[in-house]
Amino acid sequence: VFSPRAQFSLKPEWEKDILFRVSGGYYYQPPFYRELRDKTGTVQPNVKAQSSLHLVLGSDYSFKLWDRPFKMVAEAYYKSLTDVNPYTLENVRIRYAANNNATAFAQGLDLRLNGEFVPGTESWFSFSYLKTKENTDNRGDIARPTDQRFKFAILFQDYMPNIPSVKIYLNLVYNTGLPGGSPSYADPYVYQSRLRDYRRADAGFTYVLTEKNASRREGHWLKKFKEFSFGFEIFNMFNNQNAITNTWVRDVYTKNQYGIPNYLTTRVFNLKLSVRL
């Protein structure tokens, strides 16, 4: 296969520090062995490479706010996919149709702002929008297994004003729900439910013992360390139940199948020690 791609960058001679990027191309993805097996387990050697025509527009904007450095990165993209080999997802098992009988598209936007909201610490905010659908045998568009509409995340770092050796961070994540998948080899057009939205908050506290190493006398036991710190973290601090996939269970009486969510880890407490010589 031949996959021509190109990228162009433009940096105008403006007072503002902005870089524009344009990239695109035609990409082929040859099938692997698993993508050649149909629902009976038979290998279909005539499955073709899936292809994608994509276009990406981006910009990097560096600026100063409160006399501190910040950067805003933005990207918008569109992909048109042909000869798609559709697949279904059950729990962690991916089943391919072994047939290039679908077309698809993906479009989205990624935004990220990072900088020193607090002097000497890096924080960032990010937002993503994604829409990806596929059309199998001209039956109409349905959501692809990766169709997660919105993603929003914040990582904010700070330190205690009177004790700068004590650093804290807060990580917040909110994602809209993914498609819930479908039983193996079932018609995905029948199973178009979604998982619950993903919500998570993490917090961490770190005490850096080597913060004042430059002013310490020679021979002090901490002088031999470039970094020596210990901390305490709480992951998923509000104990949210976040599902990642469904396991499908059949009712023997009605013959219906029901999705049982597979949940990720709930609240976790973590102690950490970091040493660098």
What name fits each language-model region?
Residues 1-17:
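Signature of Gram-negative outer-membrane beta-barrel scaffolds
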Residues 2, 51-55, 78, 103-107, ...:
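Residues that define the transmembrane beta-barrel architecture of outer-membrane proteins
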Residues 6-10, 57-61, 109-115, 125, ...:
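Residues on the lipid-exposed face of transmembrane beta-strands in outer-membrane beta-barrel proteins
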Residues 11-13, 21-23, 48-107, 230, ...:
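Membrane-embedded beta-barrel scaffold of Gram-negative outer-membrane proteins
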Residues 12-19, 64-70, 119-120, 160-166, ...:
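Short loop/turn motifs that connect adjacent beta-strands in outer-membrane beta-barrel proteins
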Residues 24-30, 63, 76-83, 129-133, ...:
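Transmembrane beta-strands of outer-membrane beta-barrel pores
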Residues 78-80, 99-182:
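Gram-negative outer-membrane beta-barrel transporters
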Residues 120-123, 174-183, 207-277:
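C-terminal beta-signal and adjacent terminal beta-strands/loops
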